[in-house]
Amino acid sequence: MAEKVKLIDVSKCTGCRGCQLACKQWNQQKAMQTENYGTYQNPPDLQYNTWTLIRFQEVAEKDKVKWLFRKDGCMHCTNAACVKVCPSGALHYTDFGTVAINHSVCIGCKECVSACPFNIPRYDRVTDKVYKCDLCLSRLEADLLPACAKACPTGAITFGDKAAMIKKAYARVKELGGDANVYGDKFVGGTHVIYVLQEHPKVYQELPYKPSVPFSVIVWKDILKPLSLLAAGGVVAGSFLHYILHGPKLPDEPGQGKGGE
């Protein structure tokens, strides 16, 4: 099955939050009471039941102020730190290249929360589970667009085969010129959500400049964990071999002492 990519062209985003509402509706997520912090951004951040958020950012430009809108959510990394650290296998790759959570086996350890370079997974104390966007996996399996892409009225969110979406992104950057750039296809193995940004990535809030899998995750998952499993396997294998060759260990006979007796 061909890998899929969601392309977000922020130059076309008007901040209408249609995608945010569509995500809530499709995933049957209730709204939460929030406080006004002097911004149109609401809620203030991603939550365990808010998987898509339009970030509102005011940027000074010469003698005026302009808005930057950015849809935030899971980037669905090819080399996903969350999948690497998940001890239960709850976080896994799908046939579309995206990352989903099997909540029936999630143990609420929050390792993925700490490991994610994009600060995406959110923990719910009530259910003791972690939640994030799954790119509408149930819709993809039914050959439907993700709810956010379906709802976007300006064409800022599009969805399709990976190669076609990346090609479209670079064509759009060439059309925009200036500081426009493609964000997402060059790190963590390539993400399955990519942006066309109007400004340098450093300008955008809550968007890491050069995200990567934490070194501690690499050391544990790719080096220490296999070695520990190998060592543990060696102990088990040695014990089994001893059992086969010598049988079970018998208790000492009465009167048989140990040491120098």
Question: At which residue positions do the language-model features occur?
Answer:
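Non-ligating segments of multi-cofactor redox enzymes
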Residues: 1-261
